[in-house]
């Protein structure tokens, strides 16, 4: 960050504030990045902020106070996040030169050792919980998609997670052809596609597994697994993420299912479940050590079934799969 680029930067995105200060706001908060950074938060959050933040905290009642402060201090140029709420933008547009600066999203791509440890813990919790669930036994007993999703969420919290990374996906039968289908109150069928994760101290995990039964399902599973494995084999520092997407996509296309691979090959994650870079054909971000990404190729045959396999990968001298959960 070049201090000459702007006089002050306004941060309102909760996870950017947590990244900088370790304070997770529960209501509206503003981080002002300048020579002496400060977090402004409501009276309701003051006690929490004082206990957790590494950046000085001040109480404020309304954003108008901040606007008046800018005027008094002679602020001329303000940097903002692209996600700045529109009501705040309207209060400052026209009075100052504004420039979008999303440098924190780039900075957050490289994880510290502490962040990697938290991610590894989240993965360990989610995988332990999955094993305790025993999905195939649940199917034999006639469990529903809803019941399995609820129990897996409970197990992750019981084992130390603060919450789920996202709404757990348990889809089966023809529902599995929808990549982000909602769980239904119906008994599990085959295949069973599961996508789940949890948070530990704010950091996310994300895993997908598919349980197949018929010969056709096994054939698709093997294609997806080949794309998954070869994409991971190609990972190393210096590689563009679009090249990884191309590897996975080309394998699936060779088998004639290119049009059935309807999402990107993966994404980065950390405090947010989806962070930069996106492992897609349009993203030319170059991999660096200590990035954490997912690899999740999938094939979805409309009204029949879908298969997705997803693992988290740490970029070291090569791609290192995080966790030890078997795929088969």
Where are these regions (language model features)?
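Active-site neighborhoods and metal-handling regions in enzymes and metal-associated proteins
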Residues: 1-328
